[in-house]
Amino acid sequence: MNSVFGKHFMDKILIYILTLVVILTVFGFLGKSWWVFDLMSHFRVQYFAALSFLGIFFIKERKWRKTFLAFAFALVNFSLVLPYGGMVNIVAQADQSEIKILSMNLDYKNASYQAARSVIDTTNPSVLVLQELSADWDAQLEDIFSKFPHSIKRPYNSFYRFPEFIKKRKLSLGIFSHLPFEVITVEEFSDNPIPYIGVRLKFKEKQFSVFGVHLTSPMGKVRTEARNKQLGSLVYEIQKNNQPTIIVGDFNITPWSPYFKDFIQRSELLDTRKGLGVYPTWPKQIFPLMIPIDHGLVSSDIKLHSFNRGPNFGSDHLPLILNFSIS
């Protein structure tokens, strides 16, 4: 009797889960209607995995309608994930003109300084882009920064519109380079003090631009609107920049958000993940919920050689490493 009751209870739970994931799948397409729906767009891989599991379960239970529903919506999510499928990380044959960018969100709460130093030393990037650079991090990495002859740091407020009771920290966005550069923009958005930094670099008589970004996290309507305005400002900067372009950093948005899709379309940049893998980067401490919110985007005249995540260094984000050359 107890086993029958337990089985019936489990069936009910799985049906409720099926209903919930189907609803989340549908609402994820309505991100422009409400900021909460936009959050629902980010977990396509998780929806696909959950629905596939439920479909297999309902096959065993011979519940064909629920099986069809689970696999139908699993297919919907799979179609969105598929363009990012792949395990090959070499895109084009490397050559003597290869440039390497390392992008790291340090996480101001993270104190694993030696681990971060090891990532930077091992990667040996031509250009290092850092987000959430605090006073503590600045002091701990000072000798590493001294190895880069060209650098810029920009203070910004990552706590825009956070509640007053939350302790605030002074954070910076930084670009450190072995290649000479000139600053082309250090922008504070008019309604929001979250910056991006743009620099124009020169490598073997070829010029290209790098933008380092840390967009506002979409925690509420106001912050979501701020992030979306920042995406629009970036489009403007890209359109007026007549150079091969790379944008790296923490975008706080996944490829499945309608706002990200609009950004890619308007900027005409290429998503370096496509065809290589989803490569989720955050939150590193909760692996089943990890989503790709750190990005490396390039213009069509950038030849990508490889796109990889770097190793864990204690942050809630994993770093990104791009190797490329200028066409």
For the regions a language model picked out, list residue spans one by one:
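N-terminal signal-anchor transmembrane helix
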Residues: 60, 68-122
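Membrane-embedded alpha-helical segments of integral membrane proteins
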Residues: 12-57
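Short, aromatic-rich membrane-interface segments at the entry and exit
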Residues: 37-38, 64-70
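Juxtamembrane helix-break-helix junctions at the cytosolic face
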Residues: 55-65
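Short, Lys/Arg-rich, polar N-terminal cytosolic tail immediately upstream
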Residues: 1-7
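Short acidic/polar active-site loop segments enriched in Thr and Asp
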Residues: 126
